[in-house]
Amino acid sequence: ENDTEFIIRKDLFFNTNLKYSLADNLDDLYIPPVDVFPAQVRSDVKQYLKNVKDGGVLIGRAQLDYHLTPAKNHHIMMSAGIFEDMFSGYGGEYLYFTPNTNYSFGVDVFKVFKRDYDWRFGLLDYENTMATLNFNYRNYGTIPFDMRISAGEYLAGDVGFTLEFSRTFYNGVYFGAFATFTDVTTEQFGEGSFDKGIFFNIPIVGNLVNYTW
């Protein structure tokens, strides 16, 4: 898997992600089908994964981002293209941030379209408009951490909010946890009751040998 960023000019960027599978056991993966609300936006991921082995080089992302600052402390980013493995689209983000504070807030709105299972440029018959209000806070105390609260409409059309905590260490290691609560009932969601998880990123080059956490 390869991630590349092309800087076309100081305010225009093109980001790509290309994938190639050397070996996998994805044929053994089983995900029960979803036949109730929310819409099946992720549970058919195996339809994408089964093409990884024989699909050659696959496009995970091909995204164009344009940044502008129309006024002091007001930042806008407009994006279009293939956002990720399963969705393409277009949209924009607004962020208000002042350098002397430890918080920011903003809004993002995106129109997204579900990609075809072959990972190329075709689209399936699903689309939605996502919109969220966002608040970000950075704690500089003894145990520094970042907090993010987002509220709005999500990919499946459900409405609710997400609470996320994360921490970035001096050597570049990054990890966190999140929980999302929406108007989807426990019965509709199924196993797990609500969306939650952890995430992490461990660099394999650069400053990883710095153990000053």
Residue ranges and their predicted role:
Residues 1, 16-18, 47-50, 72-84, ...:
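Transmembrane beta-strand segments that form the barrel wall of outer-membrane beta-barrel proteins
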Residues 1-64, 68, 121-125:
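Outer-membrane beta-barrel initiation region
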Residues 2-6, 64-68, 92-96, 133-137, ...:
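Residues on the lipid-exposed face of transmembrane beta-strands in outer-membrane beta-barrel proteins
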Residues 6-14, 69-73, 99-104, 140-147, ...:
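Short loop/turn motifs that connect adjacent beta-strands in outer-membrane beta-barrel proteins
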Residues 22-28, 72, 84-88, 100-102, ...:
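Gram-negative outer-membrane beta-barrel proteins
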Residues 36-42, 124, 140, 144-162, ...:
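Flexible, glycine-rich linker and terminal segments associated
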Residues 56-62, 86-90, 125-131, 157-161, ...:
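Residues that define the transmembrane beta-barrel architecture of outer-membrane proteins
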Residues 73-75, 81, 85-86, 93-146:
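Detector for outer-membrane/organellar transmembrane beta-barrel domains
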